[in-house]
């Protein structure tokens, strides 16, 4: 987290009350005021972008914001009087900050044949997150009309100091149909996962559909992908396979985390941040041969992007 960027871009409710952000949570998507009397609260939910076409023309974002505000109210009511919750309650009552985010971003792109790198992905970023901003703010204004503005929002016409934050969603993404986590790329197209329930082989469902459509969804192909660390770049059967409206090579569409230029993740994050009033949980993945100069350049670009 770049604290200077965060405070420079704080929402009006924070600026008018002289509130500052001093730290973030362990996943870095929460950027809320803390002091001796206030601690931040995480009231989060995520929209499944792999189903975007099903909900883009509905009021899902609007109702999700109402839902989160209801969750915040229930927390306030249940935690009142409980020892140790005093600072969290104080922050919740005064600001009612929410964190509506997303999951399944890479799945969304892959299902449409859009590479993670390039202008098409940047366009989709702007389109989707501007919509989330508009609809969540509409909901907060309506909530304020009905229930009033909390202390830190007086004069803003809003029910909540904050509305949007993007959490990692690793577990939620599995429950949502094994889609990609948060706004990050897939680390691998096939991998072994160990859990309390046992050891499982996880495959990228979007890639599995492409292989099936081209008659090459075989165990031999998957074993080769697994041997290559989850990469499809050495699968000869995919050399001439194209997909999407723009006939993109499948190998470009299914690049894994480390195969994607990390500058692209930072640039997308910069676009996304224009529409998010908290922050984004975003990892970067560098190969072992990455130089300190290159890693420093990426982080400096992140700072410049805000």
Regions found by a protein language model. Name each.
Residues 97-115, 294-306:
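Hydrophobic/aromatic-rich, well-ordered segments within soluble, folded domains that form packed cores
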Residues 36, 49-67, 90-97, 117-136, ...:
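Catalytic cores of large soluble enzymes that bind and process phosphate-bearing ligands
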Residues 1, 41, 95-100, 160-164, ...:
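Beta-sheet entry/capping signal
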Residues 27-33, 72-80, 164-306:
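Catalytic alpha/beta core of large soluble enzyme barrels
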Residues 108, 152, 290-292:
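Domain-core detector
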Residues 1-92, 102-112, 179, 184-206, ...:
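Function-dense linear segments that define catalytic or interfacial modules
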Residues 63-89, 93, 112-169, 246-251:
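Internal maturation/activation junctions in enzymes
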Residues 4-29, 139-165, 169, 285, ...:
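Conserved mixed alpha/beta core segments that line enzyme active sites in large multi-domain catalysts
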């Amino acid at each position: 987290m770049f604290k200077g960027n965060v405070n420079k871009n704080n929402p009006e409710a924070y600026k008018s009350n002289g509130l500052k952000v001093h730290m973030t949570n362990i996943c870095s998507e929460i950027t809320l005021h803390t002091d001796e009397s206030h601690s931040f609260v995480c009231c989060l939910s995520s929209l499944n972008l792999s189903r975007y076409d099903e909900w883009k023309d509905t009021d899902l974002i609007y109702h999700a914001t109402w839902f989160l505000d209801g969750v915040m109210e229930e927390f306030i009511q249940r935690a009142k009087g409980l020892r140790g919750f005093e600072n969290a309650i104080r922050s919740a009552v005064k600001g009612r900050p929410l964190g509506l985010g997303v999951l399944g971003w890479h799945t969304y792109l892959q299902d449409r044949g859009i590479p993670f790198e390039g202008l098409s992905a940047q366009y989709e970023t702007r389109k989707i997150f501007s919509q989330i901003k508009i609809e969540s703010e509409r909901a907060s204004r309506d909530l304020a009309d009905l229930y009033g503005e909390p202390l830190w929002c007086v004069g803003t016409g809003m029910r909540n100091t904050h509305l949007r934050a993007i959490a990692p969603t690793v577990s939620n993404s599995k429950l949502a149909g094994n889609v990609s986590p948060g706004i990050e790329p897939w680390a691998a197209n096939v991998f072994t996962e160990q859990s309390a329930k046992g050891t499982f082989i996880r495959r990228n469902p979007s890639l599995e559909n492409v292989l099936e459509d081209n008659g090459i969804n075989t165990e031999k192909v998957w074993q080769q992908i697994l041997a290559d660390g989850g990469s499809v770049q050495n699968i000869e059967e995919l050399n001439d396979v194209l997909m999407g409206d723009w006939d993109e090579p499948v190998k470009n569409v299914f690049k894994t985390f480390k195969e994607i230029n990390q500058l692209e993740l930072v640039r997308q994050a910069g676009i996304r941040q224009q529409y998010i009033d908290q922050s984004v949980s975003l990892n970067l993945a560098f190969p072992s041969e990455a130089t300190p100069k290159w890693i420093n350049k990426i982080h400096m670009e992140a700072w410049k992007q805000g």
